[in-house]
Swiss-Prot record:
Membrane-spanning segments: none
Compositional bias of kind Basic and acidic residues: 28-42
Stretches for region Disordered: 1-42
Protein name: Protein FLX-like 4
Taxonomic source organism: Arabidopsis thaliana (Mouse-ear cress)
Similarity-based family: Belongs to the FLX family.
């Protein structure tokens, strides 16, 4: 039951009691009048009835004052509650705006991190191909090493043949020309061998550099994944 309902109920009870008291007084008054016609008794009874009415009026006035005070208190409480409700509504709106901003910031951070991961994954998407190329380079290096050994063996045989030809054809012009030809061939073969050796070393250096880049890219991806996990945990906590 609200304050106003309680106040109205109390007022109604008091009014009913007053009316009941008035009814009883009137009944006693009629009984008194019927029992005696003495003017003195009539005057005393009128004075007593006047006092009763004045007391009733005073009680009702006090009740009205009390009800007015209660109404003023209720009005003040209503105004205070309305102001508190307004302040609470503003705080709720502020909290909602803060939550939306926080969610937007987390979404932007997560999206940026995902884009970085996508770029890094694109850089290492051909990781297996690069590894196969490195393996092929190692195989090529071994092949070149075998060819080098074969070439060295051929050069050695050529030198033996050259010496043999020189010994057999010292007096012949043709032997001299063949010797010059074999020397030129030997120099050419040596030059080719040195060029192939140099090219192979450069290629191996490039492949090693690519391996280092792959390792760095893998570490960067692991770091970015850790950052995404941390950002998601913070979004859930918020």
């Amino acid at each position: 039951m609200s304050s106003r309902e309680r106040i109205g109920s109390n007022h109604h009870s008091r009014v009913s009691q007053g009316m009941s008291t008035s009814g009883s007084s009137s009944s006693r008054h009629h009984d008194t009048i019927s029992s005696t016609s003495d003017p003195r008794h009539l005057r005393d009874h009128q004075i007593s009835l006047s006092d009763i009415l004045e007391n009733k009026i005073a009680v009702q006035a006090a009740e009205i004052d009390r009800l007015s005070n209660d109404n003023r208190k209720l009005a003040s409480s209503y105004v205070a509650l309305k102001e508190d409700l307004t302040v609470a509504d503003r705080e709720v709106q502020g909290l909602r705006a803060h939550i939306r901003k926080t969610e937007t910031d987390h979404e932007i951070q997560i999206r940026s991190t995902l884009e970085k991961i996508a770029k890094m994954e694109g850089m290492v998407k051909n990781r297996e191909n690069i590894r196969r190329e490195v393996q092929s380079a190692h195989i090529e290096a071994h092949r070149l090493a075998r060819e080098r050994e074969e070439l060295a063996s051929k050069v050695k045989l050529g030198m033996k043949d050259l010496k043999k030809v020189c010994l057999e054809a010292e007096s012949l012009e043709a032997s001299s020309q063949e010797l010059e030809r074999l020397k030129e061939e030997h120099q050419r073969l040596r030059k080719e061998f040195e060029e192939e050796k140099s090219g192979n070393v450069e290629k191996l250096a490039q492949l090693k550099g690519m391996e280092r880049k792959i390792i760095g890219a893998v570490k960067a991806i692991e770091k970015l994944r850790s950052e995404i996990s941390t950002a998601r945990n913070k979004a859930v906590e918020n």
